[in-house]
Amino acid sequence: MSRRNVAKKREVSADRKYNSKIVAKFINHVMKKGKRALAEKIVYGAMEKAEKQLGVPAMDVLTGVLANISPAVELRSFRAGGVNYRIPVPIKEERSRFIAFGWLLSEARKRKGMCSRDRIALELLEAHSGHGGAFRKFEENVKVAESGRAFSHFRFFNTGGARRSNPSNNIGGNR
């Protein structure tokens, strides 16, 4: 077991335009190879485009999208009796937001023939209205969680692996 200290969570500073930590987290999620200025340009452009099309403030668009596609449970795999079960486990709001951003960006990146700003804006619009790729992933997550609810009692068991006895205690060669 490691003797090091547990890494402390660092606070994300709010973004410049909307003064929101949620937007700052979204920018960090979009950012690749440390190019923050480019990520900010993409996110702000996408939010402005969504704001123009919906006629709703950009922050309300983003919070509406997160309300529509943030999962309440995460599916964790558990092996019991030679069968893998996907068990729904409740998650914190921060983890839920992280998963929602991942779904949103993965579905936006699947769209071809547009710039990143337009792809993200289109995905934001669709997720806000309750359809689109990210919303489909959310619904699929809910369905699988419903079907795995019967096995949710497994989450209280130790999932750290099988218990093994100390081999030096096995006198006589019993394994």
From Swiss-Prot:
The keyword Ribonucleoprotein applies. One of its GO terms (molecular function) is structural constituent of ribosome. The keyword Cytoplasm does not apply. Coiled coil: none annotated. One of its GO terms (biological process) is translation. GO terms for cellular component: small ribosomal subunit. Keywords: Ribonucleoprotein, Ribosomal protein, RNA-binding, rRNA-binding, tRNA-binding. InterPro entries: Ribosomal_uS7, Ribosomal_uS7_bac/org-type, Ribosomal_uS7_CS, Ribosomal_uS7_dom, Ribosomal_uS7_dom_sf. Belongs to the universal ribosomal protein uS7 family. Part of the 30S ribosomal subunit. Contacts proteins S9 and S11. One of the primary rRNA binding proteins, it binds directly to 16S rRNA where it nucleates assembly of the head domain of the 30S subunit. Is located at the subunit interface close to the decoding center, probably blocks exit of the E-site tRNA. This is Small ribosomal subunit protein uS7.
